């Protein structure tokens, strides 16, 4: 059984707020949020790691490419445990890369690099880790999306109100790039 905590972020959380304390979370019982068609589950964040890294999963159905974005101060990794995810990345010189990642594959996105992804198979899962000098961005998902106690992807997509795109991302080291074009062909 996973213990519940009240935090400044959520009324009910399975993640303790104090850094330096061991804890355990059962599968899927982290802090969950729905955003678009995906479910994000945070297992460790800035509160537990003194803002050095976060650890989360993203589960979703086959769908559209998420909006291109970058993180000025955050490095991000994509490790695929189930399904297939197409990762798009542009390096700092402007060269674009595209790679279909399947179970066991890994992708690394340096800070400041525009990137996006598209889930290519239903029931895909990404394990994400992000770290950088500016802190961590795991609370972005529940602030742009909606916190949930559900254990599955949303029945209907959750699309944030337009005004949230103007305020929430900057608080969490996320810069959306609405005019960005991928030239890789997919």
Where are the predicted features?
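A short, N-terminal "cap"/entry segment at the start of jelly-roll beta-barrel domains
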Residues: 1-53, 155, 159-186
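Glycine- and acidic-residue-biased ligand/ion/polar-headgroup-sensing regions
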Residues: 73-86, 90
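Conserved metal-binding segment of the jelly-roll/cupin
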Residues: 100-121, 131-133
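Short acidic-glycine-tyrosine-enriched beta hairpin
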Residues: 48, 52, 91-111
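Residue-level recognition of conserved beta-strand positions in structured domain cores
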Residues: 55-57, 70, 89-91, 119, ...
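Double-stranded beta-helix
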Residues: 118-186
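Short histidine-centered beta-strand/loop micro-motifs
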Residues: 44-46, 66-72, 89, 98-99, ...
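Structural motif
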Residues: 84-86, 114, 123
């Amino acid at each position: 059984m996973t213990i519940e905590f009240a935090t400044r972020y959520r009324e009910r959380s399975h993640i303790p707020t104090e850094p330096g304390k061991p804890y355990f979370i059962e599968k899927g019982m982290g802090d969950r949020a729905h955003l678009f068609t995906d479910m994000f589950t945070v297992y460790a964040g800035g509160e537990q790691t003194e803002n050095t890294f976060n650890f989360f999963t993203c589960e979703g159905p086959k769908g559209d490419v998420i909006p291109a974005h970058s993180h000025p101060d955050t490095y991000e990794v994509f490790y695929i445990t189930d399904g297939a995810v197409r990762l798009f990345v542009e390096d700092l010189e402007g060269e674009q890369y595209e790679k279909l990642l399947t179970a066991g594959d890994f992708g690394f996105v340096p800070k400041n690099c525009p990137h996006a992804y598209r889930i290519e198979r239903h029931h895909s899962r990404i394990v994400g880790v992000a770290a950088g000098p500016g802190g961590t961005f795991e609370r972005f998902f529940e602030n742009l999306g909606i916190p949930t106690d559900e254990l599955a992807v949303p029945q209907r997509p959750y699309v944030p109100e337009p005004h949230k795109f103007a305020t929430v991302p900057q608080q969490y080291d996320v810069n959306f790039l609405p005019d960005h074009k991928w030239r890789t062909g997919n």
